[in-house]
Each structure stands twice: as C-alpha cells, then as structure tokens.
Amino acid sequence: MKTLRNVLILSLLCTLAFGCKQEPDPFREALGAYILRGQTGTFDLFSIQKIDSTTFRTEFERREHVFQRKMEEETVLYGSYTMQRMPKNAARHWEAMQRTEQAIKGLDSLRTVLEGRLDEIAYYDYVFSGQSVIGEEVTNYLGAFASMTPELEVIALCSERRDLHKSGGHAIPGYLQMLRRTGEEEEE
C-alpha cells in the first residue's frame, strides 16, 4: 500500500511538472515583438478579446471610399483656385488629383489580382490589456486596440477604436508599394 501511494505521488508530481509546461502564445509573441520593436524588454499580455474581422472585399471598399473622398476634395479645391485665378495652387491640386487617380487605378489592379481571395479575412481587430517594460520605462496598455492579419502580422496598434482602420490597407498585399509608386499618401 505504501508503494502504491509513493507511485501515485510520483505520478502526480510528474504530471504536474510536464503538464505545466506552457506553450508560447503566438498572438502574445507577435504583439510583444511589435511593441518592443527589437529593443530589450518584456511584454506581458493580461487579457485579449477578438472584437471584429475584416475581409479583403470590405478593406478594398474602405480604401476606395478614402480615395474617392480625397478626389472630391481635391476637385473642389482645384476648381476654387482656378476660379480665383491662383494657378500655382490650382496646379498643386491638379497634381494631387492625378496622384489620387493613379492610386484608385492601382487599387483596382490589386483588387483584380486578389479577386479569388476577396472574401478571406484580411485582419482581425482585438482589444487587449498588457504591459511592456523597456529598460526603466513601463507602458500599460489598458483597453488598447490592435489589428492583426491571420499570419499574425500587426498592422495597427492604437488607444482609440476609431483609429484602428486607418492602417487597414496595409493588410492588402502590394498596397504600400502601390502608394509609393503613385506618390500618394494615405489619409483616413
């Protein structure tokens, strides 16, 4: 009986020792790497909750809306400066209209390339709480928001949910390169 009890205790201790080995959380690892950005420090994730997801189709619609709104604004400004006979200002807005038009065409090209993946998830939105320590600097993330691709690439980190989708186009493959080619700046 004493031997059986010792065997059970030993089995329980072994189970606890091997069962307590915790696998690293890939989300925590990716978010921590983004927050630390290569600096020496630690990141502890206290809580995480997925709050939304966005498909490529929805993200393309958002980006198209952003560029169409910018085109409308530039067109109004161009017309206004032309009427006021201010050719330098009008020329600047004409150039902005041309860049925006190129960005819209580039977005259409990217959409064509991704046609078969439009209904796939581009990124997920999360609300989380955590803490990073870099040197002596401690940063608390209480109710912070993050957008992450299914491949665990962080594309946005912010304190306000309304700011979360400003970088959403970054989830579209080729989007940043297209912006660089057109010289267009992204605005939300």
Q: Can you describe what each PLM-predicted range is?
A:
Residues M1-F18:
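Sec-dependent bacterial lipoprotein signal peptides
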Residues C20-E188:
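Cystatin/cathelin-like cysteine-protease inhibitor module
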